[in-house]
């Protein structure tokens, strides 16, 4: 065969050369065109993919942030990195960065490029810009300075080593983008993504509320670093109208069948990491709820305990609140003999793959508004009433996740609210702590947003785990590390970011955390 190839290659190539402009180019374009490829992309489909990927990469931090916020832990040092800060696993924090740019950031950028100059698609343009802010906000909040203004421009502008923008500049632009997009959205124009919009199915009014709700979230993020700007943006968001009704909750819907991209990303990752066997024993990575979380729920007689957790008794899941028990994060590498007795996420709620992923809720709006009221930035309602509404909303939203009505009995909600009233006669600090203790439970399983608020407010006042061989000296880390490859492939930009922001270290604070 080798001899035959050698024998006939030259004559064939020579013949082709002699007839270069005749026979050999006949049907060349047709032969080299993939009949299954799309020459003109369908923008609506790319938008759907950007939504899926943005939601998935926001949710897929699994054991890392779940462990860091002391919801879960593992006896396995690798899986338990988030709760143990084990030095050998620190580079795992670069995964969100690595996964974000080629997917959601690139995809939403292509959507914006396709619609921005078309005056008939003003709503599509605004919605895409809002989603781009959502994606970038989740990314910069984890890393600080990141590629932003030049991100996703490799194909369009041949920018293969994008600069890292300062987080202060990123925040300024994101807030400007939200304001411009919310203003541009109009019911007089019918250009939406329709059913390809997996969040609101093209509802312009709801997208506007989502934009102002994100403005409220990001504006409040500035309280430590620039209180005046924080107040200005929070006030503007409230005036624009934020999410206050269940029908307006920003959520991604999923199914139990089909491809994995169609499944709730938090539930799907938790299941695959640990809980597919559903017997309390054969947990692949050794994961269970952490004792800090379960002990808090039990101590506060929180009716969510039986909604979120189960203990397997003789192979059967039990939600009996009296037997729920969290596993200590200090267990050192060996599976405990009583492993089966520890609580783990419930299959019909937290692990429900066709449950919606809640991106911005009524509960979050009310908790943020309660803080704004405490600061004197909002006076139409009291901090106490907003705080109470936030608690009720956080409990009632489990109806959306479970797919049932009355998941938590109204009487138990009333009893809990009465027992945890805001201490209005105490200091602002005491009341703020109460609010963000409720955020810790009420926004679960959105561990990243809880982590963001923990860094900003210091609440809940979690006690770090001083574990042998940890990477932080027994401190809860303040940011994620850039991927190692950035030091090789984008060294100049990486070095500039590190010089400006500080050492690429887990304890270096991002701009708004300083």
Label every model-predicted segment.
Residues 2-3, 8, 17-46, 53, ...:
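Bacterial Sec-dependent N-terminal signal peptides
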Residues 24-73, 99-102, 106, 110, ...:
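Membrane-proximal, proline-rich intrinsically disordered regions
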Residues 26-29, 346-347, 410-416:
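Short acidic (Asp/Glu) and glycine-rich catalytic loops that position anionic groups and cofactors
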Residues 40-42, 75-131, 135-402, 425-432, ...:
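Structured, solvent-exposed acidic/aromatic patches
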Residues 59-68, 144-146, 230, 449-452:
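Beta-strand acidic-aromatic groove motif in beta-rich domains, primarily in extracellular
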Residues 72, 194-206, 316-317, 323-330, ...:
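Amphipathic alpha-helical surface "interface" segments used
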Residues 395-514:
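C-terminal functional modules
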């Amino acid at each position: 065969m080798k001899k035959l190839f050698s024998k006939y290659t030259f004559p064939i190539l020579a013949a082709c050369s002699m007839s270069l402009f005749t026979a050999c180019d006949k049907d060349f374009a047709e032969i080299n065109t993939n009949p299954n490829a799309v020459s003109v992309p369908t923008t609506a489909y790319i938008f759907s993919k950007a939504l899926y990927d943005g939601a998935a990469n926001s949710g897929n931090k699994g054991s890392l942030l779940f462990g860091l916020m002391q919801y879960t832990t593992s006896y396995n040092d690798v899986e338990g990195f988030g709760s143990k800060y084990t030095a050998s696993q620190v580079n795992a924090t670069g995964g969100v960065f690595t996964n974000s740019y080629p997917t959601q950031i690139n995809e939403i950028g292509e959507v914006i490029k396709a619609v921005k100059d078309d005056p008939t698609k003003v709503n599509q343009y605004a919605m895409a810009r809002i989603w781009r802010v959502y994606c970038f906000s989740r990314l910069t909040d984890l890393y600080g300075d990141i590629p932003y203004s030049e991100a996703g421009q490799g194909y369009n502008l041949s920018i293969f080593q994008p600069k890292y923008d300062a987080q202060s500049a990123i925040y300024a632009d994101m807030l400007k983008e939200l304001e411009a997009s919310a203003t541009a959205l109009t019911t007089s124009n019918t250009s939406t993504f329709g059913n390809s919009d997996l969040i609101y199915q093209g509802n312009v009014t709801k997208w506007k509320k989502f934009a102002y709700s994100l403005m409220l979230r990001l504006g409040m993020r500035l309280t430590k670093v620039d209180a005046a700007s924080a107040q200005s943006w929070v006030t503007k968001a409230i005036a624009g109208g934020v999410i206050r009704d269940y029908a307006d909750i920003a959520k991604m819907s999923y199914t139990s069948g089909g491809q994995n991209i169609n499944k709730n990303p938090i539930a799907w990752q938790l299941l695959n990491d640990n809980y597919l066997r559903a017997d309390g024993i054969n947990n692949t990575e050794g994961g269970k709820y952490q004792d800090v979380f379960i002990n808090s729920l039990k101590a506060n007689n929180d009716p969510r305990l039986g909604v979120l957790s189960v203990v397997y008794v003789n192979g059967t899941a039990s939600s009996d609140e009296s037997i729920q028990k969290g596993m200590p994060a200090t267990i050192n590498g060996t599976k405990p003999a009583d492993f089966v007795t520890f609580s783990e996420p419930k299959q019909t709620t937290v692990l429900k793959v066709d449950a919606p992923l809640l991106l911005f809720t009524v509960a979050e709006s009310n908790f943020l508004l309660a803080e704004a009221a405490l600061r004197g930035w909002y006076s139409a309602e009291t901090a106490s009433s907003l705080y109470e509404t936030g608690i009720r909303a956080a409990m009632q939203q489990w109806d959306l996740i479970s797919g049932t009505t009355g998941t938590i009995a109204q009487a138990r909600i009333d009893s809990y609210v009465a027992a945890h009233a805001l201490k209005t006669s105490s200091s602002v600090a005491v009341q703020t702590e109460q609010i963000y203790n409720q955020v810790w439970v009420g926004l679960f399983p959105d561990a990243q947003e809880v982590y963001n608020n923990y860094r900003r407010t210091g609440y809940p006042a979690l006690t770090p785990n001083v574990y042998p061989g940890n990477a932080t000296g027994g401190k809860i880390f303040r940011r994620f590390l850039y991927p190692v490859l950035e030091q090789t492939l984008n060294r100049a930009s990486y070095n500039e970011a590190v010089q400006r922001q500080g050492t690429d270290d887990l304890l270096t604070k991002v701009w708004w955390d300083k």
